[in-house]
């Protein structure tokens, strides 16, 4: 069976459902796929059971259950991620297994914002999810319009507390379950034929309009983490790796950043699969020939980048998830002063954890396996670091935590 070719006709956007347990995230995900399936060619409906029994996948050595679905609206192609368990969300967002360009926050109109609603909003803020659209679910269970308005106000206020624009965020009421039931009974329902199905359309209209199309990786500034270094007699030194973002072409001036003082060099050759290229773009695995660089000047863990786009740092604040014993993590707590390895892009760097904070800003004196915590890290060597960058924490070769850089200190 020939593989179906991925047709790139519409812009692609990654989104996900977030919110408190049992507020209807998975039901909504199923409803969206069913509604979009009968209205756009490139979508297939998914049943609740298929999404709920999400397969396990690994990201940075951590097992996460995640369901990936895809669908199209008239203007866009969406990849949508839904996690069955709360712990899966925490791990997913921190490891960046599912990088979201925006999220649909599902809040039950009957209950209002609950503790996990707030935790997911906070997480979204900390890991850099740029936009949120709200779906007020279970509208059919709320008899009093005013109650629903109060819940909407409370959600907007909660979003504002976490520095999202609470006044501007679109809030769409509806019932995911009734929309799903209507679609299951009659899978060919069109817009305008059922009030609950129409609310799913209204939600996707809001997502289409409010969540901006992300800048493609190829349009960003060039960056490649060095994986290996070779010396070619008579030609010079070649650094290999995968282009993380942007593009690079022959003759470009680039910088070598991290571990040693930053140096400038010129790209004198590009190779991929033994073929020479004029230009290389995000996603390519390439070898880059560098002018005037000796093999000992460059090593795994450094990055090649467009000049003055990334700088080396040693101290940063991060949001970290610490693995449980069952996940292969530590069996015992650790304390300030703990010195594990930090695996960033392609290399391990030893670092010291200076201090921990809980979400409420209070000082934490120790961290238990399974905790999510803010920590200040100081590395023994400077490496190229930027806000939003992911890393793993390792000890003796095994992953004990995963984190994302929230602020650079030094």
Curated annotation (Swiss-Prot):
Q: Which Pfam family is one of this chain's hits?
A: GTP_EFTU_D2
Region of interest (G1), ranges:
19-26
Q: Recite the UniProt keywords alphabetically.
A: Chloroplast, Elongation factor, GTP-binding, Hydrolase, Magnesium, Metal-binding, Nucleotide-binding, Plastid, Protein biosynthesis
Q: Where does Mg(2+) bind?
A: 26
Q: Where is this region: G5?
A: 175-177
Q: Which reaction does it catalyse?
A: GTP + H2O = GDP + phosphate + H(+)
Q: Name one GO cellular component term.
A: mitochondrion
Q: Name one GO molecular function term.
A: GTP binding
Q: Where is the tr-type G domain?
A: 10-215
SUPFAM superfamilies, per the entry: EF-Tu/eEF-1alpha/eIF2-gamma C-terminal domain, P-loop containing nucleoside triphosphate hydrolases, Translation proteins
**Coiled-coil zones:** none
* Location of the region described as G3 in the Swiss-Prot/TrEMBL record: 82-85
Task: List the InterPro entries.
Answer: EF-Tu_GTP-bd, EF-Tu_GTPase, EFTu-like_2, EFTU_2, G_TR_CS, P-loop_NTPase, Small_GTP-bd, T_Tr_GTP-bd_dom
Q: Name one GO biological process term.
A: mitochondrial translational elongation
Query: Superkingdom, according to UniProt?
Result: Eukaryota
Localization of this protein = Plastid, Chloroplast
Q: Where does GTP bind?
A: 19-26, 82-86, 137-140
The task this protein performs is described as: GTP hydrolase that promotes the GTP-dependent binding of aminoacyl-tRNA to the A-site of ribosomes during protein biosynthesis.
Protein name per the record: Elongation factor Tu, chloroplastic
From which source organism is this entry? Nephroselmis olivacea (Green alga)
Q: Which gene encodes it?
A: tufA
